[in-house]
Amino acid sequence: MIKKLSIQPASGLQGDLSVPGDKSVSHRGLILGAISQGTTTLHHFLPAADCLSTLTALQKLGVPIKRVDTTVTISGRGLRGLTQPQQPLDMGNAGTATRLLTGLLAGQPFETTLVGDTSLSQRPMERVRQPLQAMGAQVQLTAGHLPMTITGRTLHGSRTEMQVASAQVKSALILAALQADQASTIIEKLPTRDHTERLLQQFGGQIETAPDQRTITVQPQPALVGQSLTIPGDFSSAAFFVTAATIIPNSHVRLTNVGLNPTRTGFLNILRRMGGQVTVDHEHRMGEPVGTLDVRFAQLHPVQVTATEIPAVIDELPLVALLAATANGISTISGAAELRVKETDRIATIVTELQKLGVRITSQPDGFVIDGRKSWRQPTEPLASHGDHRIGMMMAIAALRLAAPAELESAEAVNISYPTFFEDLARLSQGV
């Protein structure tokens, strides 16, 4: 397992790349396949640590699942067919799976305990416990965190006004609502990624989103039906190469079959406002909108990103910071306090790591201010992922722009979401 890598400067990125399957869709496809009737096949599944934690947890809940490389076959057990695991479910670092399974297990007729690694055990779970409790669920936390014990009970339809803009919490409530005694309504604070809603409709679920894109009604579901799905390429993974091609001169990269769900692509809107050279072509559908991203090097302008944009760019905010660090002025990102409760306090880790390069960046309670006009310098200490996959990949991209090689510590963190990241980066840059 990699611990430390030396990353060489790149004179330009060139080539075509198909990124791995979408992490969010892989999690959700596994879960919906598990509670459907019949067989579900997932093609282009993401075999990263987080998704494998979900797969293993479902197997321990009695779901027969077979995986061959990126193809997964699930023998669905139906909505009421899960069985009590023999021991606590170890969710590793998988925050998405933990919150989604909490909603699912809240209506199952047995008790389950979920545990996780050090990082996951520090992430807030009260946000999912409270609305589930209002539906009649019994969820016991440890000081607001994992370990968490869920005692399945009869759930009641409810009307929930969400206090945080979180697709994970919304999805937990949707999975609980499928098992309730009557319809449930979920009102989002801001629209968030809608993979669960789209997939649930494909599996035969009755779910409706109002024109305001914030009000969701879920009907109790007697049965879902297994599907054959091809998972699109992960937009968040593609965004690393979009960023690299944008900030490294002499770059031209094409990224194929990338998922372009509009609730995920806020990053492209921000990049274009900054003067980025990215176009979309070969658009089609694979259950979700998909297309090819064509990206070239560009000189960037500063940008202001505010709270209403955050849900559609939450995973790409480290990259927005990196782009801003090359822009010809002062950029501000605000309304992003959610970054503080990700795998790390990402506001703190972004500031720490970019300051190693001499970037003028200061933290705010809910974001940061970045002046990109100062030239970068060679770091005097190793760059670090802090065990956070997105910080590790961000700094690997940043290192390509330096004048001399740089070391990246804890590089293995990329396995959480993108195990082949460094191989793909090397193909395009010859820089690792």
UniProtKB/Swiss-Prot annotation:
Keyword annotations from UniProtKB, A to Z: Amino-acid biosynthesis, Aromatic amino acid biosynthesis, Cytoplasm, Transferase
Active-site residues from the entry: D315 (proton acceptor)
Involved pathway(s): Metabolic intermediate biosynthesis; chorismate biosynthesis; chorismate from D-erythrose 4-phosphate and phosphoenolpyruvate: step 6/7
Function comment: Catalyzes the transfer of the enolpyruvyl moiety of phosphoenolpyruvate (PEP) to the 5-hydroxyl of shikimate-3-phosphate (S3P) to produce enolpyruvyl shikimate-3-phosphate and inorganic phosphate.
Keyword check for Amino-acid biosynthesis: yes
Main location: cytoplasm
GO molecular function, one term: 3-phosphoshikimate 1-carboxyvinyltransferase activity
InterPro entries linked to this entry: Enolpyruvate_Tfrase_dom, Enolpyruvate_Tfrase_sf, EPSP_synthase, EPSP_synthase_CS, RNA3'P_cycl/enolpyr_Trfase_a/b
Protein name: 3-phosphoshikimate 1-carboxyvinyltransferase
Location relative to the cell: Cytoplasm
Gene coding for it: aroA
PROSITE patterns, per database record: EPSP_SYNTHASE_1 (PS00104), EPSP_SYNTHASE_2 (PS00885)
Domain of life: Bacteria
Annotated catalysed reactions: 3-phosphoshikimate + phosphoenolpyruvate = 5-O-(1-carboxyvinyl)-3-phosphoshikimate + phosphate
Annotated Gene Ontology cellular component terms: cytoplasm
A Pfam entry, by short name: EPSP_synthase
Enzyme Commission number(s) from the entry: 2.5.1.19
Residues holding phosphoenolpyruvate: K23, G95, R123, Q168, R346, R390
CDD domains xref list: EPSP_synthase
